[in-house]
Amino acid sequence: EIVLTQSPAITAASLGQKVTITCSASSSVSYMHWYQQKSGTSPKPWIYEISKLASGVPARFSGSGSGTSYSLTISSMEAEDAAIYYCQQWNYPLWTFGGGTKLEIKR
């Protein structure tokens, strides 16, 4: 089983600040996906196949990486971006998820 470790576990960013969330895999993976979850809702697909934005995701989000190291970046934090973000990969026959990164607004 491939283990995904996200960093940081919790972070706070000011509006307009650049934010980067990283996901490290215990073995090389071909594709990494990202989900956004807001309080009381199910996780939504956010970025798929490393860098492709899901429908409706703002262009300030981007994804990158290869091998065992991947990241999600927000170029300029907005209030609506406060959420929990999860990385996820599939390695037959298992889906595995990272533990999540809680992104809050710094006030």
From Swiss-Prot:
A GO BP annotation: adaptive immune response
Start and end residues of each stretch annotated as Framework-3: 56-87
SUPFAM superfamilies: Immunoglobulin (SSF48726)
Record's keyword terms, sorted: Adaptive immunity, Disulfide bond, Immunity, Immunoglobulin
Region (Framework-1): 1-23
GO cellular-component term (any): immunoglobulin complex
PROSITE patterns xrefs: IG_LIKE
Region Framework-2: start-end pairs: 34-48
Protein name, per record: Ig kappa chain V-VI region XRPC 44
InterPro entries noted in UniProt: Ig-like_dom, Ig-like_dom_sf, Ig-like_fold, Ig_sub, Ig_V-set, IgV_Light_Chain
Organism: Mus musculus
Cysteine-cysteine disulfides: C23-C87
Record keyword tRNA-binding present: no
Sequence segments annotated as region (Framework-4): 97-106
Pfam families reported in the protein's UniProt record: V-set
Additional note from the record: This chain was isolated from a myeloma protein that bind galactan.
Region of interest called Complementarity-determining-1, as start-end residue ranges on this chain: 24-33
Stretches the record annotates as Complementarity-determining-3: 88-96
Keyword Disulfide bond set for record: yes
